[in-house]
Regions:
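Short, surface-exposed coil-to-beta transition loops
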Residues: 94-96, 112, 122-127, 172-174, ...
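Bacterial N-terminal signal peptides that target proteins for export
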Residues: 1-8
């Protein structure tokens, strides 16, 4: 390869791998602020200094898995997904936290997060305060993708665009829970809908009929996050 061509190639690679410019980084920090502040219960064993180092590395290289070795010999990994407003943190490959920002928030309150904890060799899903309170007005954010949150109906497989979603009230959202069955722990996807009695859920039969029951079962999700079956 010609020396000049080699130099240009190295320069292009350096530009492609450079950290985000200041403005892009500030915007990324603003979007991820609720996640970067480390919500209660997320990686409590990690020191504040290690968390801060991990965050800085992840912000410098979004869409890339960054690593950090702590003094306690813990291997930490973090990945920021810009497109989905999602952050994944792994502790020594045994414990993984997935934080996903919801595309809605309650007026006057902080953005809502869904936190899922995956522990090897078992998968444990934690639903953490992402259902908005019924008596307050919701605010939908057109900048956050709706793909992970809106339920696909059998008649219409396409997810509404953000502009369409802003025009119509959000009436359904997915909730992932873990049930203990005879076959072991199984992750179950249910759809939650607001009602006058509070938040109720109805399992999607096609997803779980082989695991729990052929007929759908109804549940009520209380404000404290407790799931109760409606008999």
């Amino acid at each position: 390869m010609h020396p000049k061509s080699r130099y240009l190639l190295i320069l292009l690679l350096a530009l492609a791998c450079r950290p985000l410019v200041a403005q892009e980084r500030v915007e990324l920090e603003q979007l991820y602020q609720p996640i970067l502040e480390r919500p209660l219960g997320v990686a409590p064993a990690i020191s504040d200094s290690a968390w801060e180092q991990l965050i800085q590395k992840a912000l410098d290289a979004p869409e890339t898995t960054v690593t950090l070795q702590t003094k306690a010999q813990e291997s930490l990994e973090m990945r920021i997904d810009k497109a989905r407003l999602r952050c994944t943190i792994s502790v020594s490959g045994l414990l993984t936290y997935e934080l996903l920002r919801a595309p809605w928030r309650t007026q006057g309150e902080r953005p809502i997060l869904q936190i899922t904890t995956l522990e090897q060799p078992y998968r444990v899903s934690q639903l953490t305060a992402f259902l908005p309170k019924q008596e307050k007005q919701w605010e939908l954010d057109a900048t956050i993708p709706y793909t992970d949150w809106l339920i696909h109906s059998e008649e219409k497989e396409l997810v509404p665009s953000p502009s369409e979603a802003l025009l119509a009230p959000l009436t359904e959202m997915p909730v992932v829970l873990t049930f203990t069955t005879e076959q072991g722990r199984r992750k179950v996807r249910i759809s939650a809908t607001p009602s006058l009695e509070g938040w109720t859920t109805k399992e999607e039969t096609k997803r779980i009929k082989q695991l729990i029951s052929i007929s759908p079962q109804s549940y009520q999700l209380t404000r404290r996050g407790i799931l109760k079956r409606i008999k």
